[in-house]
């Protein structure tokens, strides 16, 4: 004879377990599913970093190495890209607030960022260096040559360029300009002596402006990698982005884009 009490308890347990399973499935509907349901990959960009991600004011479109990669990432998910403007000063807060799915605009991998956010595996090797007027190139052969009150060093606010200057050049005259993309022209015009930048950016500006030089390009102050920045909380999303980047590295896509935009 069936024990009705045991049967009821068993049914209740089964219902509870099924309910928990449904909650688990709902919880597992993470960033990948959200992006695909939306049909759009939201990409945060400062739009001021040649040759990684910059807003072409003439066309109104974003261009650069990271822009191409972001488009390919979106294609792999079957969605389109929509860019969300951010700044170096607000990048961390905007990422953590979920204003976009990824930030991809020449973002340096750092311990400080990794502690608060997720960063993909690194790609492209670069380092901190300087941009100066070609006429002054022989004046700046080491970090010590920059660390003087007479040297006006210009940086954009809130990013690793400013942090480098504050940590390593305490004696220089530090000038902070809000628009990173405008600094090379200001250097060329004599509004400052040196720009703290990165090898990728310096190489591009020297190529584009004959008034500028990057005398320490082959001997940068640091060695770093870029990474794709995301809010914490979705390991599957981080895994997917890492897998995508590994595949694009393996199939030669990243090398082709490096040849196109950087070398």
What are these regions (language model features)?
Residues 29-106:
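Extracytoplasmic small-molecule ligand-binding "clamshell" domains
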Residues 125-132, 199, 203-246, 263:
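Periplasmic-binding protein-like
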Residues 53-59, 70-79, 142-149, 161-177, ...:
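Ligand-binding cleft/hinge of the Venus flytrap
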Residues 89-90, 107-115, 163-167, 186-222:
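A ligand-binding cleft/hinge motif common to bilobed small-molecule-binding domains
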């Amino acid at each position: 004879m069936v024990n009705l009490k045991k049967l009821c308890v068993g049914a209740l347990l089964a219902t509870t377990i099924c309910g928990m399973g449904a909650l688990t499935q709902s919880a597992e509907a993470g960033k990948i599913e959200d992006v695909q349901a939306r049909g759009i990959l939201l990409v945060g960009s400062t739009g001021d970093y040649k040759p990684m991600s910059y807003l072409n004011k003439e066309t109104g479109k974003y261009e650069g190495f990271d822009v191409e990669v972001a488009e390919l990432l979106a294609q792999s998910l079957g969605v389109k890209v929509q860019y969300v403007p951010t700044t170096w000063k607000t990048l961390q807060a905007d990422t953590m607030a979920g204003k976009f799915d990824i930030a991809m605009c020449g973002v340096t991998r750092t311990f400080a960022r990794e502690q608060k956010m997720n960063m993909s595996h690194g790609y492209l090797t670069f380092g901190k260096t300087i941009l100066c007027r070609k006429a002054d190139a022989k004046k700046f052969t080491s970090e010590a040559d920059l660390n003087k009150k007479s040297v006006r060093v210009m940086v954009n606010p809130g990013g690793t360029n400013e942090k480098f200057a504050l940590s390593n050049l305490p004696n220089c005259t530090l000038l902070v300009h809000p628009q990173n993309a405008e600094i090379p022209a200001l250097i060329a015009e004599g509004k400052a002596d040196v720009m703290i930048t990165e090898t990728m950016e310096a190489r591009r500006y020297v190529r584009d402006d004959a008034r500028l030089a990057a005398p320490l390009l082959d001997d940068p102050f640091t060695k770093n990698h870029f990474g794709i920045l995301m809010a914490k909380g979705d390991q599957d999303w981080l895994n997917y982005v890492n897998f995508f980047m590994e595949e694009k590295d393996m199939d030669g896509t990243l090398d082709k884009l490096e040849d196109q935009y950087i070398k």
